Curated annotation (Swiss-Prot):
The keyword Metal-binding does not apply. The chain crosses the membrane at residues 25-45. Accumulates harmlessly in the cytoplasmic membrane until it reaches a critical concentration that triggers the formation of nanometer-scale pores (pinholes) causing host cell membrane depolarization and endolysin refolding and release into the periplasmic space. Once the pinholin has permeabilized the host cell membrane, the SAR-endolysin is released into the periplasm and breaks down the peptidoglycan layer. Determines the precise timing of host cell lysis. It is found in: Host cell inner membrane. This is Holin.
Length: 71
C-alpha cells in the first residue's frame, strides 16, 4: 500500500488529469462509433422492411404487409 501511495502522489496532478481525460475521450469515441454503426444497421433494416411492405401492398397482400410490420 505504501508503494501505491508513493507512486500516486509522486506524479504531477496535471499529467494524471490529462491521462484520465485521454482515456475518457477514447471511450467516448469508441462509444460514438458503436452508436453510428448500430444506427446505420437499424436504418438499413427499417428501409428493407419498408420496401418489403410496399411490395406486399402493391401486390395486394395485406396479410403479408401486416406480418412484416408486426416484426
Amino acid at each position: 500500500m505504501k508503494e501505491f501511495l508513493t507512486a500516486a502522489t509522486s506524479s504531477t496532478g496535471g499529467a494524471s488529469l490529462v491521462g484520465a481525460a485521454t482515456g475518457q475521450l477514447y471511450i467516448a469515441g469508441a462509444t460514438f462509433i458503436c452508436f453510428l454503426l448500430f444506427g446505420a444497421w437499424g436504418a438499413y433494416w427499417k428501409y428493407r422492411d419498408s420496401k418489403a411492405i410496399q411490395e406486399a401492398l402493391n401486390d395486394g397482400d395485406l396479410n403479408k404487409a401486416l406480418k412484416i410490420r408486426g416484426r
